[in-house]
Amino acid sequence: GLVPPHMAGRDAARIAILLPFSSENAGARAESLRLLRAAELALFERAGSNLLLIPKDTQGTADGARAAAMAAFEDGADMIIGPLFGQVARRANIPVIAFSTDTSTAGNGVYLLSFPPELEVARVVEYASRQGVQRYAYLGPQSRYGMAVNTALRDNAGLTGAQLTAEAFYTGDVEAMASASSRLARGVFEPITPEEALVLRQSEWVPHPDAPFQAVMLPEGSTRLRTLGPLLISQAVDPLVVRFLGTGLWNDEDLLREPALHGGWFAGPDRASHERFEQSYEAAYGSRASNIASLGYDALALAAHLEGGELGFSREAIENSEGFLGIDGLFRFSSSGVIERGLAIYEVQSRGFREIEPAPLTFDPLAY
């Protein structure tokens, strides 16, 4: 492959980044550019002069991803970052840092630098259970994402000695969401009086001992979430009584305008660190970073860290049990390629997301 003149004659570490730069989907093209720019920012801020970043276009197709990976191998890539969707061919001793949330694509040298919803659910359920929640409910889409959240909710509730006692799925529009909200509530919740509401607002929330469920998981974001909250209230499922829980889809400041979501909890990365990254990105490029652009930065920063270490790009180095500190906080990879993240707990309030429990600064030792 070509080497810039200033790197001629050096034994440079080659990092290929595979993204759908020419995808038919305009959103994917825009996200690819943001991820590449974030990686270039990390190259400037974190890497030495011995790292070469090589962009490859996957075109947003499986065939394109395979061709891009083969081209990266032929260019002598020491590590591959990407793709954004799906998976690429694996080659011995060349690690892949992919952005997929589909854990079935991980392993055998493929590591997922992403935000799997299972992690977010595990963290918020662990926190809610410590606050006394014993009975959980699920209200969400019957999609691959929704089913992953539902399974994680059931599993993690069980780990804390709690139960998933009610669930309702929907596919489609507001009418389907309203019908599911009604099925979930089953008419067993009594509307609270204005006097009761005043008392509840002035006191610390505790799980209601007689409620059929004390917390409900709503794995939606944006407009659909702003619709779902009021639909539950219309069924007398009041957030003053039942705690609303979310996933990383809640990490969107547009949601602050919806009073039905105030008081809700979700798990997410350290916001202070992410905001510093957003400021650096905007200063460098004059445009805003997306929520996942930081993954491009952390992937390249990880490559720079590995390149400077004694173990290089080996699995042993990538699977360091102490983990790495990135833009989105602490993370580490298991031997199966799945990511573990240190996440904070946030409460939705009218003026912003309030951190109610910080992200951990260190990981517990891995159990073997």
Predicted features and spans:
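Extracytosolic ligand-binding ectodomains
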Residues: G1-Y368
